[in-house]
Amino acid sequence: MTICLLAICLVCSGLLAGVYALTAEPIAAAAAAKNEAAIKEVLPETAVTIEEERTVDYEGASYAYNLAYDEQGNTVGCAINVSPVGFGGPIVIKVGFDANGVICNTKVLSQAETPGLGAKCVEPAFSEQFKGFDPSQKNLAVKKDGGDVDAITASTITSRAYTDGLALAAKVFQAIGQTPILLNDTPVIPSEVEESK
């Protein structure tokens, strides 16, 4: 009996390992394609060259970002990943900024919010309000908290998490150093800024 159970466990383990080996690469490729599509979706239309992903440390955490350039090599935007915690867990959001720190677009990469409630954060009815949102001119918080953002009905926790994530992305954008650099109309890569300090 023990030998039979051991044999069944070995066969099942072998099958599981085989399935993982067959699916790991396609799953990784699909995730990379989804990330690349999200980057293009959130950046300004003038972006023709997108830099490889980098990371920046901000307040003890590391954030992934991609800089984007136009045909002349001028920095036109930045896509930043943030993961605020909503009602159902982390909401992974890619936030695109133009060179002046204005939000171009947002894209939810993954979320586990309640279907029919918080999961509405992926719908354009909620996310479209962030296009053209300037965090330096408007309050990036839900109206219930005195901000300028319309919350999802019956999903205040998700709405707060989403707006908190975007506010964090705006701070990370400033930490990368884009706003002060680009206001001088001088495209500079962040690593060059660090070397000159």
Where are these regions (language model features)?
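Flexible, solvent-exposed loop/hinge segments and secondary-structure transition points
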Residues: 1-197
